Amino acid sequence: MMNIKKLISASMVAVALSGCQRGAVKPNVLFILVDDMQADAIAALGNRDTYTPNIDRLINEGMAFTRAYTNGALCGALSMPSRAMLLTGRGVFEVQSDGMKIPASQITLPEHLKNNGYRTFATGKWHSDHASFARSFTEGDNIFFGGMHPYEENGHCAPRLHHFDPTGKYDEPPFVGQNFSSKVYADAAINFLKTTEHNNQPFMAFVSFTSPHDPRNILPDYGKKYCPAELSVPDNFLPEHPFDNGELNIRDEQLLPVPRTPEQLKKELSLY
């Protein structure tokens, strides 16, 4: 699956690394990830149903890597190894434990910047181990360790989070965020950016949203943006898969009953 993270983070990585190599003024890096968002959900890349002005501006004023793909995974959670690959520059066969653990021998991008004088801040999702997180960041807040916010815990509406632990242990139980996941991560990032205004030390802010990964909880205002009846279904839509590909009982296939109708799919698309 082609992910939106290639649109923003890869270009930021290139700028950061090239700037360091030239010995120029060290650039600040805002590294934004979103979870399970496909590139074909972006208006600037051809989707006529979506309204994505901020992402469109990044594309129109920068660049979009439209032929960049994740090269697979050896586990069910594709985001875990792909995040580890993105952070370390390693291929899928080089990351360990499918990315669940990043060994000290594999330096992450924020760790490299930290070792070169950067403040490194993180908020949101970290889908690897505590030790690699501790090596990578000097500060952070509203940190989520894991893959997704569970349905049974009210999903994005009650994210289980950690404050930054300078010991790197994170052995205290998580607290429940008092707002939607995207807002608590954005608020943490904004609060950090405010501290950089009069600080000459270069920084990297790693802002890792868990949306639009399911559960498809939505903020009330955003639920009104899209009318299901006005959305298009994909050209290759079928009520059910035409043959058993061996993956028909996985979690993603349980989100809607089969046979599926265009109306059901449009409703899910409006939530997505």
Report residues per predicted region.
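Hydrophobic helical h-region of N-terminal Sec-dependent signal peptides
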Residues: S9-V13, L17
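Formylglycine-dependent sulfatase
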Residues: M2-I8, C20-Y272
